């Protein structure tokens, strides 16, 4: 979201104004910004060329229960996907209007039903941990997607549960999990 980076930068500026050079604060800011690239890197590393791929994205707001997309990691992900030639179809309970306004209505497709977003998708990226995303019908997900492949930026799911549903699962800070045979 917009508060954390703003607050880190404000503390940094205040410290510098008082003659102290806080070396850790610029590092915190840089790490926070770099973390926004992790999900795209995982998708790109797994799928390779993204031209013509359809990536479903669940969650646009920087956190659940808001439509605020300022400094949202979804912005970085979607812009990177579009630049790489992918098509993006999204769902967010609150922030679809804000994202469409920012990126342009033609840049992404916003869909009211989170399961409909998955139709024919080459992968799903989960960016915001909305409650509605916590207990999906994995069987339906697998049937809807062109490739049953989830990139979970919020570690919402138990990897074994996803693997048992025959879906490949990539999360943050965990090894990828291939579908159970």
Model region roles, listed by residue range:
Residues 1-181:
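Structural/interface elements that position substrates and couple domains in central-metabolism enzymes
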């Amino acid at each position: 979201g917009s508060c954390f980076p703003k607050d880190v930068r404000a503390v940094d500026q205040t410290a510098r104004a008082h003659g102290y050079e806080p070396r850790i604060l610029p590092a915190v800011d840089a790490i926070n910004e770099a973390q926004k690239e992790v999900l795209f890197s995982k998708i790109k590393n797994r799928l390779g060329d993204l031209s013509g791929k359809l990536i479903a994205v669940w969650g646009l707001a920087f956190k659940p229960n808001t439509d605020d997309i300022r400094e949202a990691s979804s912005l970085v992900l979607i812009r990177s996907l579009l630049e790489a030639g992918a098509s993006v179809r999204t769902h967010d309970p609150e922030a679809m209007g804000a994202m469409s306004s920012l990126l342009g209505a033609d840049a992404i497709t916003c869909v009211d039903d989170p399961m409909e977003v998955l139709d024919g998708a080459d992968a799903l990226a989960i960016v915001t941990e909305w409650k509605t995303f916590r207990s999906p019908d994995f069987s339906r997900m697998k049937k809807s997607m062109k490739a049953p492949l989830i990139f979970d930026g919020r570690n919402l799911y138990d990897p074994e549960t996803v693997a048992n549903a025959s879906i490949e699962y990539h999360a943050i800070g965990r090894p990828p999990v291939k579908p159970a045979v």
